[in-house]
């Protein structure tokens, strides 16, 4: 197991524990509590996948955080917070690419939580890149404005967009939706890669082909999902 994967899980477990204490003292609002529930499910899934005990991981995560806070000076902390709290808007797509109308020969659509995934299943044997415009905070994807899948010729063949009726989504929601889109496109023998900007802020790491670290089993499952549930 990669050491960064382990330490990331341990710190996430401890930070969830801290947020749970905030919720127990009735200091969290509705979005805060909703994210807490979502992240609890995510941590349980990650713990099961990694074969790690959440309680033990939480204790180690506490030690990691305490060590970092002890080593960090007040001035460094202020500078880090000033930089991290400044939300940035990143753009893979031009205004023309975002606003362009597109059509599907074999339209498929799936609602994935608060996001809508659309794709053209008539597209086969193409090299496809996923581009997105989104905001970033704490060096993580915060809010997705729009994601589109483009062929090398510039044709739009897929899209992920927030549902107006379900405002608010998490980084995990976006990753799940991207997994569904990739799975559906790869089912038809297309080669899909993700833009460097999206890789950097949506995933901690990427595979050697420029895509998110999805296992073959995940891809087959996601492809089957979009074929059977749209």
Curated annotation (Swiss-Prot):
Residues 180-215 are annotated as: CPSF4-binding. This is Non-structural protein 1. A motif (Nuclear localization signal) lies at residues 34-38. Belongs to the influenza A viruses NS1 family. GO terms for cellular component: host cell cytoplasm; host cell nucleus. Transmembrane segments: none annotated. Keywords: Eukaryotic host gene expression shutoff by virus, Host cytoplasm, Host gene expression shutoff by virus, Host mRNA suppression by virus, Host nucleus, Host-virus interaction, Inhibition of host innate immune response by virus, Inhibition of host interferon signaling pathway by virus, Inhibition of host PKR by virus, Inhibition of host pre-mRNA processing by virus, Inhibition of host RIG-I by virus, Inhibition of host RLR pathway by virus, Interferon antiviral system evasion, RNA-binding, Ubl conjugation, Viral immunoevasion. A motif (Nuclear export signal) lies at residues 137-146. InterPro entries: NS1, NS1A, NS1A_effect_dom-like_sf, uS15_NS1_RNA-bd_sf. It comes from the Viruses. Residues 205-230 are annotated as: Disordered. GO terms for biological process: symbiont-mediated suppression of host cytoplasmic pattern recognition receptor signaling pathway via inhibition of RIG-I activity; symbiont-mediated suppression of host gene expression; symbiont-mediated suppression of host mRNA processing; symbiont-mediated suppression of host PKR/eIFalpha signaling; symbiont-mediated suppression of host type I interferon-mediated signaling pathway. The dsRNA-binding region is required for suppression of RNA silencing. Upon interferon induction, ISGylated via host HERC5; this results in the impairment of NS1 interaction with RNA targets due to its inability to form homodimers and to interact with host EIF2AK2/PKR. It is found in: Host nucleus; Host cytoplasm. It comes from Influenza A virus (strain A/USA:Memphis/10/1996 H1N1). Inhibits post-transcriptional processing of cellular pre-mRNA, by binding and inhibiting two cellular proteins that are required for the 3'-end processing of cellular pre-mRNAs: the 30 kDa cleavage and polyadenylation specificity factor/CPSF4 and the poly(A)-binding protein 2/PABPN1. In turn, unprocessed 3' end pre-mRNAs accumulate in the host nucleus and are no longer exported to the cytoplasm. Cellular protein synthesis is thereby shut off very early after virus infection.
